């Protein structure tokens, strides 16, 4: 092989010399090629090299390949500048390197940027223009490619500390102008100069930038030294913006240290290079981090003046120096003043002229931050039982942790590039070293890890080392498990490793860090080169070192062309031996070896070393200090942002320590959470606020009110809490301080906020529950602030308590806040284009984790999203100024609009962002809100989390409700402006209405307040009574006039006159008592009862009719007596007492032989029966066992005097009391009554028995007299029967006439005997003589009052034009009761086992309504399951499904035959037992109705409403009725189970379907209709908008939107969404979706479609009242045809759009999707952690998973 290889070497060399070759660039040196002699075969394919198969070296890795394996070429990464027209040089590479180049690992430049990482630093650079520098003589060198080997070994010089004396002296000079103060809340304008480096490792656009990156940072590492580790001082806390004085850096940096060319300084760099660098440094546009999708936005209406461009013009600057342009040659001098280590700088280095509002807020800020942070750390230590104060010689942990936390936070400036996170927790590591003292704990400005050098002879301590980081392994084989021939392997490996080490050594590194293993040969070669090796380093640790030192990670040795080295001040390895051993540990002492990279130039990481305790205690301290660092960092940023905004906070007392319960300490359940009294910091909901421990506020001039937050602590089980990173735990624990619901202020008159000791934080509760004190937060769903009388959105709370609490209870197990919920904010984001009037991105939910991967710095958000003029909207292609962005959260919306200015704002090249605001509440200046002076945003404010910025904007607690200089709320009352270049963004907060969702209630609510129609009815009754009494009065006057004007021919004229006077007195008394009693009844109101009961009014009307008949008969009798006494008459004929023979004849026909003349009654009305409705509902018998009326003892004294009129010549004026056995003797005329044969009948009747006369006519129940005298009932109440008894007293020879009102039994007989089956009824054809006007008025009303009494004597008049009155009467009829009872006696709620007496013993004044007697009918059943089983069982027989009731009325309006068919009678009755308080309420409501012109429908069917608005009556078509007959059993089952299991449902309950028919026998008029009775979803509501939604916009638009009761459709809602959106809370949205999901699944299962969601917007209560209606239609063949016609477009309309009528499954999907999109969810504390955007297809996915299982969805938590 060798002979072939060297066959003709001379000839080959000669031929090669003839071929012209281009000169190799320095980085293509053949020194790093594999020797030809050691490579006889191809590295890749093992092909033997011959004269014809020549060797080819890869120009990148140096290995030898054949022509086939090295046939690729790439552009040469040469440093030489090429002309634009000249093609770039190409070099040969192997297949492996070519693939690496294609994948982007090897960039097409000089290889310096091995991994291209986009990043940027904080761009504010506000001090560029205002800073001068004297350090322009600083020389900056740069070298391209590998550094030439210096004369003196650089590694040797860095190992001798004495060689650095000159640098140290320069360090002291720089140090004298810097402070050692590290107070953490002071924030630095970190980029106050033009920097020639980037803020993160791994990015370079050129070699000069690579080395410049090191130079700037490295040069300042001298000046900074250890001056970051001084004591924390609060004296200069107010100096936020820092000094911009010149800082001389007079260090002449040696070329062998800096690596810069000696002939290039800062002045030689042109402006273009600086601009390019600034754009690279500040231009976040390089990072195309995709923001989450947006949804359509709803911006509140802006005021008119906002459209005026003058409003957007920036005001004058506060500091004129900020407007000066930068002097580019001086930029390098700012490096030391800037402090490249983090935002926070020593406070005494600030220039007072740059501090804004320092006089007002400095003291408050200092006290707030210092006191709050120390209190937080103290309580964290207290929770872990760690010593806080000094113990002997040992210093307490409180001061140590406070100092270390602030120091670590000071050193941080997180890389906010795409590759770096914002979370400071990822940049701080804590190491526990159980030795030394506590005071020896320190912060290392760099990386500390458990590693050691690979060889003991390698140097372990190097000052100013150069670090080279190599990824992968340093081995020969670059591909795992590759096979080679053994004979060449060893030689090739040694040659390759020599080449690799030589390549490494060419860059002069002091330390080589390798990710994986290193060959033993390579280790020996590195030792010989005096390069310290550290191998097997984890990738994460390698990246940390790279980030802090600035070194780039070279992927492999093949790409090691021009790497970027890292630097630090000191590299050393130390070994620590444990001196503190915990009691549980073995006595053996352990050793720990740590490697230090101290003094790193990048502010991207530090390490805290904890000493002075055993391992267990240090772990606890580690836990606390991780919290402390994050809190300090976060407080610092927010404090700086607060200062930039010019806000002020109150200086509040710091007396009570706070308590924080740690999530990983579940055993300590007694850890309460309280706060510092009267104090809140600006960290919004993530910082502790204040609370009083039940003691009054101490006098404080700055304390104007109590602060409270909306954040509610929670109970719930957290899994894996120990895995939560420290920043998450800290944010959560800071959140737990904000756990007072609004009721803590509103419920206390003395203004004290109770402690939260009773609201303990528990993370391990087996069954998550909501504590009682949290309900106010849920029901209010708002946050309150009481600060000097300033309250936000407090009016919303009271109107939402009931419904929101109901929603909370209905879904207690849904979503409870977890630890992750408190470290992020969930907002709804939307974007719309104003220029085009289109929605670019629909509203969607976006969760931003604070300082997380999806978060952005505030400044970067402004630059990328709002100020980038090159970025256009992908939806509408319009620029940023054409759009409005809207973020909504809780009770507010933040609207962001952008405009372009006519002139540039200063400082665009330096990245200056200007801030100012205009107060909307201050007096206008020239018609515009006054503006503050504009200032430049500080770097710390620039780096504030945008998520936290949003939280501050939305929060209502005191930390966010900061006060501007004018005294108004900064976020609520001011327009906030941010400007950059020509662009200005305006942020405006506006309160929004968040609606609660109200589903149809399971138990219907009946409003018992006075209703207008009831008032009208009661007035009509009074009017009719007055007409009656006036007529009686007139008749009495006429009769009396006859007695006065005619001569007496009788023997007792005086007695007759006296009797008439007594009758007149009785009339006046009755009139007065009637009015007084009725008025008293109307004025006495009881809860849950009708103030005016229509059933009482009906009974009164019926009784007045009987009263009119009695008075008419009485007056006729009186007139006959006058005629008999004063006129000539036969002596042997007795007077006709009853006056008219017609009535007596009809009574005789009814087999009423006599009327008892002396019936003892109580002074109570029939309306007073205490158990009236109870009888109706439970079937009680109210006849006592003796069959007698019981007389209450307490009313005996109120019994009125006897009201009879009698005149007896023998007895004079003495009352004649007759025993009950006495009867009126016949006076030889047929007009006298015989009563002897009625005694037994009446007794039986009163007890409740029924008798039938000989001719089959129903005999009424009656009652025998029980006392020895005639008692007229108490007439003080109109409700009493007007008992006008005519009584004929016994006489011997001379006849005696006694005139009395008829006894109660007379009217009772009339009530029971009044049967329209008899054409000879007394009153049906009666023509009144004396009360004709009243009778005419009554008949004219159309009420048929003389129908037989219903069950339990209910009086329900029938109106021919009101079908519900026919239904109501049918439901109370005995025929209906008999059909309903059947064989199932237990379900009989209208039992008639006992007769209901008209005159019971309970005083009417004790009752105001029949509702006192109502009993929930569901009590008669054992359980809901029994109801369902019985209900289904009864449906097995068709004859049991429907009940048919017929009756006839022969009243004065005419004879009519009525018929009512009750479909599914028993099932509906069982449903009403569950849904209605009682059957009586249902019947009472149906008693009256009115025709109603319902809008929105197209069916043109009959609609009616019950007069109390409780029910809707809708005509049902034949098809709908047939459909319901089919799916009726499924409907009853679904609705009953939903109610019993409390599963959400939005179905509007149908409580009955009836067929009503009537036929007038005269004229033949007929009426027949099928109707359903449905609950009125809009009962007792005032709606501003009403929608009927089907989920389709096709033909769903109502152009008439002006009417008050106009029903709007889908397209109307879609059009209104941009301007008047409907916002709902997260729980309300989930409740709505669950209900709709359940109902649509059920409706689809029974093949129902074309239903609608009726939505009423109640702005008074902030509620959405909704329910699904019109679900009676199944998808039958006609609907199939309609779908086809509408789809084809034969009858008009778009052909491609989906019709409104589609299959049930398609309808369900479309309906769900639309209802989800129509109602926008505003995130709140109940929002789930994982959010699915509203416009996603998740509904369809869930549908397949839970198909046809709506109950599972409803019950799932």
Swiss-Prot record:
Residues 1395-1719 form the PIPK domain. InterPro entries: Cpn60/GroEL/TCP-1, GroEL-like_apical_dom_sf, PIKfyve_PIPKc, PInositol-4-P-4/5-kinase_C_sf, PInositol-4-P-4/5-kinase_core, PInositol-4-P-5-kinase_N, Znf_FYVE, Znf_FYVE-rel. One of its GO terms (molecular function) is zinc ion binding. Residues 1729-1739 have a biased composition (Low complexity). Ubiquitous with highest expression levels in pollen, seed, and senescent leaves. It is an enzyme of class 2 (transferase). Gene3D superfamilies: 2-Layer Sandwich (3.30.810.10), GroEL (3.50.7.10), Phosphatidylinositol Phosphate Kinase II Beta (3.30.800.10), Zinc/RING finger domain, C3HC4 (zinc finger) (3.30.40.10). It holds the Pfam family FYVE. The keyword Membrane applies. It catalyses: a 1,2-diacyl-sn-glycero-3-phospho-(1D-myo-inositol-3-phosphate) + ATP = a 1,2-diacyl-sn-glycero-3-phospho-(1D-myo-inositol-3,5-bisphosphate) + ADP + H(+). Residues 317-337 have a biased composition (Acidic residues). Zn(2+) 1 binds at residues 42, 45, 66, 69. GO terms for biological process: endomembrane system organization; phosphatidylinositol metabolic process; pollen development; vacuole organization. Residues 1014-1087 form a coiled coil. The PI(3,5)P2 regulatory complex regulates both the synthesis and turnover of phosphatidylinositol 3,5-bisphosphate (PtdIns(3,5)P2). Catalyzes the phosphorylation of phosphatidylinositol 3-phosphate on the fifth hydroxyl of the myo-inositol ring, to form phosphatidylinositol 3,5-bisphosphate. Plays an important role in maintenance of endomembrane homeostasis including endocytosis, vacuole formation, and vacuolar acidification processes. Required for development of viable pollen. Might mediate recycling of auxin transporters. Component of the PI(3,5)P2 regulatory complex at least composed of ATG18, SAC/FIG4, FAB1 and VAC14. This is 1-phosphatidylinositol-3-phosphate 5-kinase FAB1A. It comes from Arabidopsis thaliana. The lineage of its organism: Eukaryota, Viridiplantae, Streptophyta, Embryophyta, Tracheophyta. The gene is FAB1A.
């Amino acid at each position: 092989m060798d002979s072939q290889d060297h066959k003709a070497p001379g000839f080959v060399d000669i031929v090669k010399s003839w071929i012209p070759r281009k000169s190799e660039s320095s980085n293509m040196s053949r020194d790093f090629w594999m020797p030809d002699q050691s490579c006889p075969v191809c590295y890749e394919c093992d092909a033997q090299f011959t004269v014809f198969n020549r060797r080819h070296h890869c120009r990148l890795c140096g290995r030898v390949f054949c022509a086939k394996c090295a046939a690729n070429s790439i552009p040469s990464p040469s440093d030489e500048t090429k002309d634009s027209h000249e093609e770039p040089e190409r070099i040969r590479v192997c297949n492996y390197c070519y693939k690496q180049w294609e994948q982007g690992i090897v960039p097409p430049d000089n290889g310096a940027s091995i991994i291209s990482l986009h990043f940027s630093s904080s761009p504010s650079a506000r001090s560029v223009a205002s800073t001068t520098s004297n350090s322009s003589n600083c020389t900056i060198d740069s070298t391209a490619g590998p550094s030439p080997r210096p004369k003196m070994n650089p590694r040797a010089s860095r190992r001798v500390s004495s060689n650095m004396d000159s640098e140290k002296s320069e360090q002291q000079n720089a140090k004298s102008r810097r402070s050692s103060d590290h107070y953490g809340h002071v924030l630095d304008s970190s980029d106050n100069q033009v920097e020639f480096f980037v803020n993160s490792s791994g990015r370079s656009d050129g070699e000069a930038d690579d080395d410049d990156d090191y130079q700037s940072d490295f040069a300042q590492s001298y000046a900074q030294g250890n001056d970051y580790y001084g004591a924390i001082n609060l004296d200069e806390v107010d100096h936020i913006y820092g000094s911009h004085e010149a800082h001389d850096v007079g260090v002449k940096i040696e070329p062998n240290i800096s690596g810069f060319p000696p002939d290039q300084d800062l002045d030689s760099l042109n402006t273009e290079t600086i601009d390019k660098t600034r754009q690279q440094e500040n231009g976040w546009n390089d990072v195309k981090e995709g923001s989450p999708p947006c949804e359509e936005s709803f911006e509140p209406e802006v005021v008119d003046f906002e459209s005026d461009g003058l409003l957007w013009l920036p005001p004058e600057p506060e500091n004129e120096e900020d407007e000066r342009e930068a002097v580019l040659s001086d930029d390098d001098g700012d490096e030391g003043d800037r402090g490249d280590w983090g935002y926070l700088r020593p406070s005494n280095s600030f220039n007072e002229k740059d501090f804004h509002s320092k006089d007002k807020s400095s003291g408050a800020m200092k006290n707030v931050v210092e006191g709050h942070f120390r209190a937080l750390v103290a309580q964290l230590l207290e929770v872990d039982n760690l010593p806080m104060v000094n113990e002997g010689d040992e210093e307490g942990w409180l001061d140590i942790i406070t100092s270390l936390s602030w120091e670590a936070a000071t050193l941080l400036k997180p890389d906010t590039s795409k590759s770096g996170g914002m979370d400071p927790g990822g940049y701080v590591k804590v190491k526990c070293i159980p030795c030394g003292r506590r005071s020896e704990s320190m912060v290392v400005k760099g990386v500390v890890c458990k590693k050691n050098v690979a060889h003991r002879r390698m140097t372990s301590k190097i000052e100013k080392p150069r670090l080279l980081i190599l990824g992968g392994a340093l081995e020969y084989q670059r591909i795992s498990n590759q096979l080679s021939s053994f004979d060449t392997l060893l030689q090739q490996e040694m040659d390759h490793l020599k080449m690799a080490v030589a390549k490494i050594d060419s860059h002069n590194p002091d330390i080589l860090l390798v990710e994986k293993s290193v060959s033993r040969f390579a280790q020996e070669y590195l030792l010989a080169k005096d390069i310290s090796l550290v191998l097997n380093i984890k990738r994460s640790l390698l990246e940390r070192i790279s980030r802090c030192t600035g070194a780039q990670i070279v992927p492999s040795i093949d790409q090691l062309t021009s790497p970027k080295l890292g630097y630090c001040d000191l590299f050393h390895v130390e070994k620590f031996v444990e001196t503190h051993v915990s009691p549980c540990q073995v006595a053996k002492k352990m050793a720990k070896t740590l490697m230090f990279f101290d003094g790193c130039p990048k502010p991207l990481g530090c390490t805290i070393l904890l000493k002075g305790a055993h391992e267990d205690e240090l772990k606890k301290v580690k836990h606390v200090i991780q919290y402390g660092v994050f809190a300090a960092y976060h407080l610092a940023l927010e404090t700086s942002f607060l200062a930039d905004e010019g806000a002020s906070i109150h200086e509040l007392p710091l007396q009570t320590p706070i308590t924080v319960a740690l999530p990983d300490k579940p055993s300590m359940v007694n850890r309460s959470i309280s706060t510092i009294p009267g104090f809140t910091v600006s960290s919004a909901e993530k910082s502790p606020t204040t609370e009083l421990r039940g003691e009054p506020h101490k006098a404080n001039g700055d304390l104007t009110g109590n602060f409270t937050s909306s954040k509610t602590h929670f109970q719930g089980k957290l899994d894996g809490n120990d895995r939560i990173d420290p920043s998450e735990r800290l944010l959560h624990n800071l959140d737990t301080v904000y756990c007072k619901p609004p009721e803590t202020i509103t419920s206390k008159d003395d203004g004290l906020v109770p402690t939260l000791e009773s609201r303990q934080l528990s993370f391990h509760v087996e069954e998550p529950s909501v504590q009682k004190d949290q309900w106010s937060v849920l029901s209010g769903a708002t946050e309150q602030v009481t600060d000097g009388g300033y309250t936000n959105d407090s009016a919303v709370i009271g109107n939402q308590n009931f419904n929101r609490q109901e929603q909370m209870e209905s879904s207690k197990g849904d979503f409870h806040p977890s630890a992750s919920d408190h470290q992020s904010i969930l907002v709804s984001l939307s974007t719309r284009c104003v220029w085009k009037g289109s929605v670019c991105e629909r509203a969607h939910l976006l969760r931003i984790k604070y300082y997380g991967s999806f978060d952005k710095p505030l400044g970067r958000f402004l630059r990328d999203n709002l100020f980038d003029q090159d970025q256009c909207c992908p939806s509408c292609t319009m620029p940023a100024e054409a759009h409005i962005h809207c973020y909504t959260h809780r009770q507010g919306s933040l609207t962001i609009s952008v405009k372009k200015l006519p002139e540039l704002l200063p400082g665009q090249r330096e990245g200056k962002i200007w801030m100012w605001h205009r107060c909307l509440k201050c007096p206008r200046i020239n018609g515009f809100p006054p503006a503050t002076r504009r200032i430049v945003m500080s770097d710390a404010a620039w780096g504030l989390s945008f998520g936290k910025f949003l939280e501050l904007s939305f929060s209502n607690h005191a930390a966010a409700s900061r006060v501007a200089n004018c005294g108004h709320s900064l976020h609520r009352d001011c327009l906030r402006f941010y400007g950059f270049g020509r662009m200005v963004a305006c942020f405006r907060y506006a309160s929004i209405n968040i609606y609660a969702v109200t589903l149809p209630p399971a138990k219907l609510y009946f409003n018992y307040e006075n209703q207008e129609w009831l008032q009208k009815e009661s007035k009509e009754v009074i009017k009719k009574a007055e007409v009656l009494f006036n007529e009686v009065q007139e008749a009495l006057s006429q009769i009396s006039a006859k007695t006065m004007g005619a001569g007496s021919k009788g023997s007792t004229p005086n007695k007759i006159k006296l009797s008439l006077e007594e009758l007149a007195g009785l009339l006046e008394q009755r009139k007065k008592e009637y009015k007084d009693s009725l008025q008293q009844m109307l004025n006495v109101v009881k809860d849950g009862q009708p103030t005016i009961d229509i059933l009482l009014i009906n009974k009164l009307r019926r009784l007045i009719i009987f009263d009119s008949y009695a008075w008419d008969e009485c007056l006729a009798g009186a007139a006959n007596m006058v005629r008999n006494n004063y006129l000539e008459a036969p002596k042997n004929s007795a007077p006709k007492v009853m006056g008219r023979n017609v009535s007596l004849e009809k009574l005789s026909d009814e087999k009423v032989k006599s009327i008892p003349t002396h019936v003892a009654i109580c002074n109570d009305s029939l309306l007073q029966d205490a158990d009236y409705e109870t009888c109706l509902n439970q079937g009680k018998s109210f006849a006592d066992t003796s069959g007698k009326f019981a007389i209450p003892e307490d009313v005996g004294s109120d019994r009125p005097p006897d009201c009879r009129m009698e005149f007896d010549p023998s007895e004079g004026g003495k009352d004649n009391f007759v025993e009950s056995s006495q009867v009126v003797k016949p006076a030889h005329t047929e007009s006298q009554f015989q009563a002897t044969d009625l005694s037994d009948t009446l007794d039986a009747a009163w007890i409740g028995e029924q008798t039938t006369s000989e001719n089959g006519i129903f005999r009424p129940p009656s009652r025998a007299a029980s006392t020895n005298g005639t008692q007229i009932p108490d007439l003080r109440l109109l409700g009493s029967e007007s008992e006008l008894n005519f009584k004929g007293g016994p006489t011997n020879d001379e006849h005696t006439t006694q005139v009395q009102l008829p006894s109660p039994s007379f009217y009772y007989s009339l009530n029971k005997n009044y049967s329209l089956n008899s054409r000879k009824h007394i009153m049906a054809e009666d023509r009144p003589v004396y009360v004709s006007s009243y009778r005419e008025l009554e008949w004219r009303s159309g009420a048929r009052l003389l129908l037989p009494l219903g069950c339990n004597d209910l009086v329900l008049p029938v109106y021919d034009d009101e079908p519900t009155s026919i239904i109501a009467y049918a439901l109370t009829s005995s025929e209906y009761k008999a059909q309903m009872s059947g064989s199932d006696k237990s379900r009989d709620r209208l039992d008639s086992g006992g007769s209901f007496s008209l005159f019971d013993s309970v005083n009417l004044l004790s009752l105001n309504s029949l509702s006192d007697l109502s009993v929930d009918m569901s009590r008669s059943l054992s359980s809901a399951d029994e109801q369902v089983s019985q209900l289904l069982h009864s449906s097995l027989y068709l004859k049991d499904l429907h009940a048919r009731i017929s009756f006839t009325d022969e009243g004065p309006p005419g004879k009519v035959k009525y018929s009512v068919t009750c479909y599914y009678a028993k099932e509906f009755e069982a449903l009403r037992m569950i849904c209605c308080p009682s059957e009586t309420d249902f019947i009472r409501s149906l008693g009256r109705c009115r025709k109603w012109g319902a809008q929105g429908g197209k069916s043109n069917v009959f609609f009616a409403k019950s007069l109390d608005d409780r029910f809707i009556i809708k005509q049902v078509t034949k098809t709908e009725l047939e459909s319901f007959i089919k799916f009726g059993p499924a409907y009853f089952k679904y609705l009953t189970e939903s109610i019993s299991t409390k599963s959400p449902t939005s179905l509007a309950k149908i409580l009955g379907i009836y067929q009503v028919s009537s036929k007038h026998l005269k004229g033949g008029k007929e009426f027949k209709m099928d109707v359903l009775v449905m609950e009125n979803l809009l009962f007792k509501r005032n709606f501003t908008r009403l929608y009927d939604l089907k989920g389709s916009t096709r033909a769903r638009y109502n152009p008439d939107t002006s009417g008050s009761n106009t029903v709007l459709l889908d397209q109307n809602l879609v059009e209104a969404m941009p301007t008047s959106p409907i916002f709902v809370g997260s729980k309300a949205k989930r409740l709505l979706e669950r209900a709709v999901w359940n109902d649509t699944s059920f409706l689809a299962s029974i093949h129902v479609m074309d239903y609608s969601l009726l939505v009423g917007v109640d702005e008074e209560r902030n509620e959405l009242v909704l329910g699904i209606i019109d679900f009676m239609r199944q998808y039958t063949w006609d609907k199939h045809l309609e779908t086809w016609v509408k789809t084809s477009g034969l009858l008009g309309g778009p052909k491609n759009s989906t019709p409104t009528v589609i299959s049930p499954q398609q309808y369900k999907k479309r309906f769900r999707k639309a209802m989800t999109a129509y109602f926008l969810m505003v995130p709140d504390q109940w929002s789930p952690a994982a959010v699915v955007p509203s416009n996603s297809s998740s509904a369809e996915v869930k549908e397949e998973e839970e198909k046809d299982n709506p109950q599972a969805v409803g019950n799932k938590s």
